[in-house]
Amino acid sequence: LSVLLRPSVPVDQWFALSFVASLAVLEVVRSQLATHLSSAEIPQTGLKWPNDVIVAGGKISGILLEVEGKALIVGSGVNIAPVRRVDSQNIVPIALADIWPDGAHDLPQPYDFATAYLDRLAFWYDRFCQSGFGPIRDTWLENALFLGQHVAVQCDAKVLSGVFHDLGMDGTMLLLDDSGQTRHITTGDVKLLGS
């Protein structure tokens, strides 16, 4: 699903919309799981920096931003029906159908999921436009996977390792590297070490 937005904030703050969208997807996924599974059956769900939604260790959604003139296209893909098992960025894909009671029976319809997603996206987008990245960052960190854990980050041809220490106000991963320096990671593929 792609949504065209015309943010009223400066362009250098548009990065935050990937965090906004991932929070919206996460909330809808959790809501769907809570409706159909007992609390004991609900697998771990969370956010993987910078923009993936993870359920039971698998990637259920990713977010892509694209600037188009004075607008921003927010693309969100969510796996509802079963997906082909391929290793993508060190995370195996997963779909709601993989953890749904009775398999794919009574899965949410894409239209219903999209409607719920657009509602949550509007909520978080409004909050961002009114209050900035701070509240988005705080909520994202509450749901972050690998925070405080030792990770490896593939940045182009280089691999950095250290502890995922924090999320910068510019959306960067703050990595306390093995030499004790804080690195500001702007892009990369994150993998938990020792797992």
Regions found by a protein language model. Name each.
Residues 9-11, 15-45, 55-195:
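Long, positively charged amphipathic alpha-helical accessory segments at protein N-termini or as interdomain linkers
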Residues 49:
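A cytosolic small-molecule/anion-sensing beta-strand core signal
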